[in-house]
Amino acid sequence: MILLVDNYDSFTYNLVHLLEELGAEVVVRRNDDVSADEAEEMAPSHLVVSPGPGRPEQSGATLDVIRRLAPTTPTLGVCLGHQAIVEAFGGEIGPAARLLHGKTSLVHHDGEGIFAGLPQDFSAGRYHSLSAARVPACLAVSATSDDGEVMGVRHRELPVDGVQFHPESVLTLPVGRDLLENFLER
């Protein structure tokens, strides 16, 4: 079972439906309706942290859930979820170089982990005004955009990935589906 922490975003159920199409059972809990203790007791096979408005520190229990589950549970953060991963591990979030809502960018990646087998420089949908300003040493930058923004991070030791773009967006499909499939195989 996948625990999906919903950060009150309209894209949450796009993620749910895509994960279910890939055969996953998904349980959705809002960020103010789940604690780190409850998330741990659920013993999910995977954790997905959804997009959402605002900053990671304003997203209910999101940071606590990431910190609690990340050592043992494959974790994927999308947009705000990606930013929350960066912040949970000691990085900093700041204003993006430019606001991008419903725009596409080319994503260059390292071809490893969730990016294995994906085409290089694929087009991805972006919907964000914040981005990773400082990535902590425990995270590797796994993808960047054509304008130099961090588009992906991967923990150097734990099964944790974040993507700033939206794999569930029609602007990223079908590559986004393949990325989620790679995540589920972790």
Where are these regions (language model features)?
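A glycine-centered loop/beta-turn motif at secondary-structure junctions
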Residues: D146-R186
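Cysteine-nucleophile active-site neighborhood
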Residues: P44-A116, S123
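Catalytic beta-strand/loop cores that center a nucleophilic Ser/Cys/Thr
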Residues: G113-E157
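Histidine-centered divalent metal-coordination motifs
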Residues: C79, H128, H166
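N-terminal beta1-alpha1 cap of cysteine-dependent amidohydrolase-like domains
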Residues: M1-P71, L80, V175-R186
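Generic structural signal for residues in well-ordered beta-strands
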Residues: V26-V28, I93, V141
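Structural signature of beta-strand start/N-cap positions in the alpha/beta core
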Residues: M1, A24-E25, S45-H46, P74-L76, ...
